[in-house]
Amino acid sequence: MSDINATRLPIWGIGCDPCVGDDVTALLTRGEALC
């Protein structure tokens, strides 16, 4: 979980947009599930 949070904050820069951040987290989680 820490890796996902650390990845989305600096790279995506969505720290100030919780809604989009949640969507990105969901996409990353689904991607990991597919792998």
From Swiss-Prot:
Location of cross-link Cyclopeptide (Ile-Pro): 11-18
Pfam families referenced in this protein's UniProt entry, alphabetically: Amanitin
Domain of life: Eukaryota
Distribution of this protein across tissues and organs: Expressed in basidiocarps.
Keyword Membrane recorded: no
Propeptide segments, given as residue ranges: 1-10, 19-35
Modification after translation, per record: Processed by the macrocyclase-peptidase enzyme POPB to yield a toxic cyclic octapeptide. POPB first removes 10 residues from the N-terminus. Conformational trapping of the remaining peptide forces the enzyme to release this intermediate rather than proceed to macrocyclization. The enzyme rebinds the remaining peptide in a different conformation and catalyzes macrocyclization of the N-terminal 8 residues.
Example of a GO MF term: toxin activity
Keywords: Thioether bond, Toxin
InterPro entries for this protein: Amanitin/phalloidin (IPR027582)
Crosslinked positions (2'-cysteinyl-6'-hydroxytryptophan sulfoxide (Trp-Cys)): 12-16
Role according to the record: Toxin belonging to the bicyclic octapeptides amatoxins that acts by binding non-competitively to RNA polymerase II and greatly slowing the elongation of transcripts from target promoters.
The family this protein is said to belong to: Belongs to the MSDIN fungal toxin family.
UniProt miscellaneous comment: The typical symptoms of amatoxin poisoning are gastro-intestinal distress beginning 6-12 hours after ingestion, a remission phase lasting 12-24 hours, and progressive loss of liver function culminating in death within 3-5 days. One of the few effective treatments is liver transplantation.
Protein name: Beta-amanitin proprotein
UniProt organism field: Amanita exitialis (Guangzhou destroying angel)
